[in-house]
A protein has these predicted regions:
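N-terminal acidic leader/helix
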Residues: 5-30
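Acidic, low-complexity intrinsically disordered segments
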Residues: 36-79
C-alpha cells in the first residue's frame, strides 16, 4: 500500500509518500526540468535496506507530472 499527499506551504514541489502506514518520505519535482527525485527516504524503506516504495512513488509522481495531473492525494494498493 502506498499513499501520496501533495506538499503544501513549502518551497518544495512534490509529494509525501507513505508506505504501509509508516513514517513518510518525500518525492520532489524540479518544475523547470521535470526531474523527479527522492528527497527523503521513508523509515520503512530504510528498514528494508533499499528504496522500494521510494522508487515506486518516484515513478508514479513522474507519470502524474508528465500528464499534468497532480491530485492532492492518491492511494495505491496491490497484492
Amino acid at each position: 500500500m502506498l499513499k501520496l499527499i501533495k506538499i503544501f506551504n513549502s518551497n518544495s514541489k512534490g509529494y509525501w509518500y507513505i508506505p504501509e502506514n509508516s513514517a513518510p518520505g518525500m518525492i520532489e519535482i524540479d518544475e523547470k526540468t521535470g526531474e523527479v527525485k527522492i528527497a527523503i527516504e521513508s523509515t520503512y524503506d530504510k528498514e528494508l535496506g533499499y528504496p522500494y516504495f521510494a522508487n515506486k512513488a518516484k515513478g508514479i509522481v513522474k507519470q502524474m507530472w508528465d500528464k499534468q495531473e497532480l491530485p492532492d492525494e492518491k492511494f495505491f494498493a496491490w497484492g
